[in-house]
């Protein structure tokens, strides 16, 4: 009986750098730590595997199934591509905008992969999931007990933290009946004030850890323009070492918790305490001063 792979998922609001962070981290898990990895992209943008495959968007399960007639007509080799570090890549895809539910594509894809034995022999299955909305579809890797460990990519910006708290709420809902747990917050820095302290404090309140603080560096964008991870583009760069540290922490992470999401009032007060947003009194005083 082969060991079961660890099923992890990266969630985070759109534009936070979730796919970039996950691919850079997984590249290190594969190359430095010798882990066998499959990425299952669950974002309708289908960009969860671009930096591993060094290509534009990969053909998706839903698109290929539609071309052939149904998922039953697909073969595993039609949808699985091998990229940097031997990482296997699949994009579930999504429907045309305004039609249907993207979550259905995720469900269809994961069921197909499991039935075809795609997960056999893997150390990690990684789901890359849009996280602004934890609707039924996007919550599917959590809800169906597929993903066991959730990592939330966030920053010190208000909307990123708001999304992180919402995702924690979604995890809590399913953690009580299933085995899904929160593995930690990954701070993908936007260089906002006191960001490290702020996310550490948010993590504490959510009953988790800030597993790593990823500093902002232009080399990430330079690598992205070439459709590469930093590890492939410039393995000696200090930023590659940041992703190596994060990969190591995930590999050895034993702090898997049931989160304690906070109320909106508490989140807003936290942002005021750290100076991210002003309280009304300060804002009014500033406006009055500007008016004189």
From Swiss-Prot:
Assembly and interaction partners: Homodimer.
HAMAP family: NifH (MF_00533)
Keywords tagged on the record: 4Fe-4S, ADP-ribosylation, ATP-binding, Iron, Iron-sulfur, Metal-binding, Nitrogen fixation, Nucleotide-binding, Oxidoreductase
One Pfam family matching this protein: Fer4_NifH
SUPFAM superfamilies membership: P-loop containing nucleoside triphosphate hydrolases
Highest taxon above the source species: Bacteria
GO BP, sorted A to Z: nitrogen fixation
Binding site for [4Fe-4S] cluster: 101, 135
Cofactor: [4Fe-4S] cluster
UniProt binding sites for ATP: 12-19
Post-translational modifications: The reversible ADP-ribosylation of Arg-104 inactivates the nitrogenase reductase and regulates nitrogenase activity.
Residue(s) carrying ADP-ribosylarginine: 104
EC number(s) on file: 1.18.6.1
Function in brief: The key enzymatic reactions in nitrogen fixation are catalyzed by the nitrogenase complex, which has 2 components: the iron protein and the molybdenum-iron protein.
Protein name listed in UniProt: Nitrogenase iron protein 1
Enzymatic class: oxidoreductase
Family, per entry: Belongs to the NifH/BchL/ChlL family.
Cofactor: binding comment: Binds 1 [4Fe-4S] cluster per dimer.
GO function terms (MF aspect): 4 iron, 4 sulfur cluster binding; ATP binding; metal ion binding; nitrogenase activity
UniProt cross-references to NCBIfam families, sorted A to Z: nifH (TIGR01287)
């Amino acid at each position: 009986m082969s060991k079961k792979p660890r099923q992890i998922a990266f969630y985070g609001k759109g534009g936070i750098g979730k796919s970039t962070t996950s691919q850079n981290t997984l590249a290190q898990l594969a190359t430095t730590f010798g882990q066998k990895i499959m990425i299952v992209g669950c974002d309708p943008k289908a960009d969860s595997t671009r930096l591993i495959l060094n290509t534009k968007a990969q053909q998706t399960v839903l698109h290929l199934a539609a071309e052939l007639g149904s998922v039953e007509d697909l073969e595993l080799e039609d949808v699985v591509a091998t990229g940097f570090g031997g990482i296997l890549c699949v994009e579930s895809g999504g429907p045309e905008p305004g039609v249907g539910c993207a979550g259905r594509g995720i469900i269809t894809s994961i069921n197909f992969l499991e039935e075809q034995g795609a997960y056999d022999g893997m150390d990690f299955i990684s789901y890359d999931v849009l996280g602004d909305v934890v609707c039924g579809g996007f919550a599917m890797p959590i809800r169906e007990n597929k993903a066991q460990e959730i990592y939330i990519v966030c920053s010190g910006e208000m909307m990123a933290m708001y999304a992180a708290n919402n995702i924690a709420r979604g995890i809590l809902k399913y953690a009580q009946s299933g085995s899904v747990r929160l593995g930690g917050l990954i701070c993908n820095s936007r260089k906002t004030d006191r960001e490290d302290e702020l996310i550490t404090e948010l993590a504490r309140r959510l009953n988790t850890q800030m597993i790593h603080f990823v500093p902002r560096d232009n080399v990430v964008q330079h690598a992205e323009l070439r459709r590469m991870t930093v590890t492939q583009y410039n393995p000696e760069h200090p930023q590659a070492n940041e992703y190596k540290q994060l990969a190591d922490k995930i590999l050895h992470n034993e702090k898997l918790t049931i989160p304690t999401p906070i109320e909106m009032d508490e989140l807003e007060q936290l942002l005021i305490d750290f100076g991210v947003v002003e309280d009304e009194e300060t804002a009014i005083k500033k406006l009055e001063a500007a008016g004189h």
